[in-house]
Amino acid sequence: MQQLNPSEISEIIKKRIEKLDISSEAKTEGTIVSVSDGIVLIHGLADVMYGEMIEFEGGVYGLALNLERDSVGAVVLGDYKDLAEGQKVRVTGRILEVPVGEQLLGRVVDGLGNPIDGKGALETTLTEPVEKVAPGVIARKSVGQPMQTGYKSVDTMVPIGRGQRELVIGDRQTGKTALAIDAIINQKGTGIKCIYVAIGQKQSSIANVVRKLEEHGAMDHTIVVAAGAADPASMQFLAPYSGCTMGEYFRDRGEDALIIYDDLTKQAWAYRQISLLLRRPPGREAYPGDVFYLHSRLLERASRVNEEYVEKYTNGEVKGKTGSLTALPIIETQAGDVSAFVPTNVISITDGQIFLETSLFNAGIRPAMNAGISVSRVGGAAQTKIMKKLGGGIRLALAQYRELAAFAQFASDLDEATRKQLEHGQRVTELMKQKQFAPMTVAEMGLVLFAANEGFLDDVDAKKVVPFEAALLSYAKSEFGDLLAKINEAGDYNDEIAAGLKSCIEKFKSTQTW
């Protein structure tokens, strides 16, 4: 056995002592001063960051939102009934993060990314911060690819491009959610991943949306983030940011994603509630001063990023691909008042709006889109050739029809040209009607728009336009399938395609009388 002499032993001990890391990690502890309505006032947290996760006793977390000289105001993320005055609070040194990745597709999660669908734990280990800075101007690319919703009226008159923010605004019960759900269903087979964020809705409504998505095979490419009406205001405030982070995962890897916020009015209400409870000074309509920033920092994250950004983000793994995150925020108005605080804010942030009207909805025109004030500021550049060529006449026909219809109420005798224009407008209005859960392909839209533009509907009674359209599409699918496939593939419009569409409609009309 080898003998160690005392000098060697002391030398080893000295080396060990030199290597020993005695710098301990000091973390401050605070004490709860008061708890009320999900807001906790804490004394003694010196080194807390804004937006940092703080840990209460019992494994409950909170979010530091008010940093004052001698106290910290935090919002509890979850149940606060077990929190009491005098309990200890610790800082975590972490900003709030949520799970991201392909494994979330087909799942229903809460505002923090915890699964709530009873299908077990998430298989992803990747997490990313909830709050992120939007890509800068240099990292972006202009919108140039279409994002088809499957609705004739939307895709012709207010086209949406990948990376655009298009507001869907209207009173309650005007079909806002229906339009968004159909847009998700229409992305089946396109490779676009979808995120549906439900904010402040009834649990039964959220369950109904999930069931409809499952029935139409759309849950495979969709993540549902749910912060229901019964969830704390903190969850309703955070859910849109969590959903956006999940969507950015796909965008930053050169893929396309679509996110729907249903609806941001309720997020603004939740934030107003939190701000008032934190005793922040109220402004217009009792909203805090930064309610514009609340929505702008969220919606600016929806963008189309260029190849360099994607390549840099993925460390060269993905090359030559652009990524996009398209946002469809929904805003609920009160009695059609679009000049209220939150609607005007979001209108100014987004790249256009689809305005849904109660009067049109009740008149059976669904989707109930007002073509006059609905607009897409950047989507025109992303439209396919066939939609751009054939869709122009539709907006004009509808605008003229609305104007003449108002005038015709007072005039008893109308000249022939005016009467023809009115009848054409009436048929186009009927043609724009579309049932829910029945999205159309580009070729199908092109066919019916061609029929309207070329006067093939002029001898069809206005009341029979909808059945005429259904019969025409059925005939085209069986007899002219190759033509439709060709249009869907390229979206082009030339003399050959125009001749093919004309031949299809003429042959159809020769077999049936309308």
Swiss-Prot record:
Pfam family for this entry, one: ATP-synt_ab_N
Taxonomy of the source species: Bacteria, Pseudomonadati, Pseudomonadota, Gammaproteobacteria, Oceanospirillales
One annotated Gene Ontology cellular component of this protein: plasma membrane
Residue sites binding ATP per the record: 170-177
Source species of the chain: Hahella chejuensis (strain KCTC 2396)
Keywords on record: ATP synthesis, ATP-binding, Cell inner membrane, Cell membrane, CF(1), Hydrogen ion transport, Ion transport, Membrane, Nucleotide-binding, Translocase, Transport
TM region positions: none
Subcellular location: Cell inner membrane
Enzymatic reactions: ATP + H2O + 4 H(+)(in) = ADP + phosphate + 5 H(+)(out)
Enzyme kind, highest EC tier: translocase
Protein name: ATP synthase subunit alpha 2
Entry membrane topology: Peripheral membrane protein
Cysteines joined through disulfide linkages: none
Record carries keyword Thylakoid: no
Enzyme Commission number(s) of this protein: 7.1.2.2
